[in-house]
Amino acid sequence: MYLYTLILLFLASANVNAYANPGACSGNCWTHDPGLYQRKSDGKYFRFATGGGIHIASADSLEGPWTDDGYVLPSGSIIDLDGKTNLWAPDLHYHDGTYYLYYAVSSLGSQNSATGVATSKTMEAGSWTDHGTTGIESTPSSPYNTIDANWIAVGGTQYVNFGSYWNNLFQVEMENGLKVKSGATPHQIAYNASGIHRQEAAFMFERNNYFYLTFSGGIALGYNDTWPAPGEEYFIAVCRSTSATGGFVDKNGVSCLNSGGSLLLSSHDFVYGPGGQGILQDSSKGFVLYYHYADTRIGKAVEDYQFGWNQLKWENDWPSV
């Protein structure tokens, strides 16, 4: 909890020039909790976002121009829970010739949640098949909330990271891209002990024999009603480990299970509350951090959020923006 307080104090006093501004974006630049993937066949970019049946946008470059292509699941999910027509937090991966998209079915403040999955050969609108629940589900008696799924494969083993608030971030082994492994039990990989445990949006990736766990912390929404106190808005942090299944620590060696986390990106210049992040291994730009943010020159409502991206820089195997 003490370390998490230090992060908030640093956010409130950070040099506004410490970060590079987001890369250029033209066309449809709205997004929320983006998922981003580059098609294997031709390098075209597809960007997915929270809302409706998961928004789809596409472009031939990260800079755009981005076009609005419709929805992954125009009629919503076949999972019968509140929120089935307003899906959240898309996560993309490619495996054995198929694109997989994980999505969350839930409602604000509820643990009645499930992680669903849809598949496609192209990522184009109209090409997606909904397979319903992965078996990653939660109820009010669960220690976690099964939203914000993120897939990673290590050798021949697949895992999904998930979680938001409650006891924060968990991981579970998958049988395949569609279903959780029979008998698998989720285990905790990160926890923020302070306040109401504002931690979510796990995204894990591998580089140079390290596994990096990025996540979002702080207040994610409601900026159109009240600005949070300086430093309490959304931000992105990172820990790393030599194992994908645990042992994550920050730059100071503090465990991510004990409120650890090194700041990766926070508010600066016109960028406010960056979060809902992921990492794209771009064919030409290398590791790219992508996220949504409120542009203070445009507006602070969710409807005004913008697509942000930055190429990561590296020092001593730690990323920076």
Swiss-Prot record:
GO annotations of cellular component type: extracellular region
Sugar-bearing residue positions: 192, 224
Protein name: Probable arabinan endo-1,5-alpha-L-arabinosidase C
This protein's record includes keyword Glycoprotein: yes
Catalytic reactions of this protein: Endohydrolysis of (1->5)-alpha-arabinofuranosidic linkages in (1->5)-arabinans
InterPro entries with a match to the protein in the record: GH43_arabinanases, Glyco_hydro_43, Glyco_hydro_43_endo_a_Ara-ase, Glyco_hydro_beta-prop_sf
Catalytic residue list: 33 (proton acceptor), 200 (proton donor)
Gene name as annotated: abnC
Function: Endo-1,5-alpha-L-arabinanase involved in degradation of pectin. Its preferred substrate is linear 1,5-alpha-L-arabinan.
Presence of the UniProt keyword rRNA processing in the record: no
The species this protein was found in: Aspergillus fumigatus (strain ATCC MYA-4609 / CBS 101355 / FGSC A1100 / Af293)
